[in-house]
Regions:
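Conserved alpha-helix/loop element of class I SAM-dependent methyltransferases that forms part
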Residues: 58-75
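Conserved class I S-adenosyl-L-methionine
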Residues: 77-86
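A short acidic, Gly/Pro-enriched loop at the edge of an enzyme's catalytic core
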Residues: 130-138
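Class I SAM-dependent methyltransferase Rossmann-like catalytic core
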Residues: 46-60
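N-terminal auxiliary segments of SAM/dcSAM-dependent transferases
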Residues: 1-34
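Class I SAM-dependent methyltransferase SAM/SAH-binding core
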Residues: 89-131
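A general structural motif
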Residues: 75-77, 100
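Non-catalytic substrate-recognition/targeting regions of SAM-dependent transferases
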Residues: 37-41
Length: 138
């Protein structure tokens, strides 16, 4: 199945009142990028200029999960891998909607995985997207 130009994310960003332009022009971009690329506490739960800015999960990924289930015909028998899962919010929502589905998430952020939602943490692992440990079609 080809994904084409599906966009599940834009609707999440268009609902916010954040100043996206100010965020990238008000601070030293090189410093912010260097800190963000560590994918640690500063990126996830530090100042907004470095990344997420410590937002508490509010359920916003449920809309994306519902859209993906419809678009791809996912079911309780599906196997779902989220590469770059961060704190696993999307997988958390998918698992709530499809409790029988096999979900796994991988990310390069130790901090993200260690600070993911407890309900999904055991499904997440530290891996590089270029060197996944999963067999094809598994």
């Amino acid at each position: 199945m080809t994904m084409g130009n599906l966009d599940f994310i834009t609707s999440l960003h268009t609902r916010t009142k954040r100043d996206y332009v100010g965020r990238v022009t008000d601070a030293d971009k090189a410093e912010c990028a260097t800190v963000a690329r560590r994918w640690g506490k500063d990126y996830w739960d530090g100042d907004r200029k470095y990344g997420y800015g410590g937002y508490k999960y509010d359920g916003r990924w449920s809309i994306v999960a519902e859209s993906m289930i419809r678009e791809y015909g996912l079911s309780d028998r599906s196997s779902i891998l989220d590469v770059g899962c961060g704190k696993g919010f999307l997988l958390y929502e998918l698992k709530k909607l499809l409790p029988g589905a096999k979900v796994r998430g991988v990310d390069v952020s130790v901090y993200g995985i260690e600070n993911s939602k407890e309900e999904i943490r055991s499904c997440l692992s530290l891996e590089n997207a270029n060197q996944l440990s999963f067999a094809d079609n598994s």
